[in-house]
């Protein structure tokens, strides 16, 4: 979750389309302005972005991620996992949302954001992520 993870994340998206970089920048900027949730990076999948609640709001002993996302260059997609269920994600207009195959996955859904999503739907993703955080808070 340190500076190296952040650098790896930005190196991974350095050659992506500008709209992908803009999507991530919009999401990061939004959540880093808040004091009740934040964005952080890990080296998972070569560098990813995670949106989390601090421990005291998550009623947990450590931070809890309510969303994880990373760029898949081969598919030209942003792969997302969310605390929302597939049905709850569909309320925000996201199609093709599935239950994760890994039964030990703590997040409840996964979706691949294609070009129309990462070009035009950053705000919809932010709203869905805020709903996931509220759900996690109980």
Please name every model-derived segment.
Residues 100-138:
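Charge-biased C-terminal accessory regions appended to nucleic-acid-, cytoskeletal NTPase
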Residues 39-116:
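Short, conserved beta-strand/beta-arch hydrophobic-aromatic motifs that form part
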Residues 27, 59, 78, 123-124, ...:
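Generic hydrophobic secondary-structure signal
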Residues 1-46, 138:
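Charge-rich, low-complexity N-terminal segments
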């Amino acid at each position: 979750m340190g500076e190296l993870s952040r650098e790896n994340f930005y190196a991974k998206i350095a050659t992506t389309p500008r709209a992908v970089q803009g999507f991530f920048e919009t999401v990061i900027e939004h959540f880093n302005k808040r004091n009740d949730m934040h964005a952080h990076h890990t080296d998972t999948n070569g560098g990813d972005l995670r949106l989390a609640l601090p421990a005291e709001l998550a009623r947990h002993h450590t931070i809890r991620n309510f969303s994880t996302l990373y760029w898949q260059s081969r598919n030209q997609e942003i792969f997302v996992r969310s605390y929302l269920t597939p049905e709850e994600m569909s309320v925000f207009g996201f199609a093709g949302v599935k239950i994760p195959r890994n039964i030990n996955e703590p997040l409840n859904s996964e979706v691949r954001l294609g070009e129309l999503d990462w070009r035009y739907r950053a705000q919809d993703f932010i709203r869905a992520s805020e709903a996931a955080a509220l759900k996690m808070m109980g």
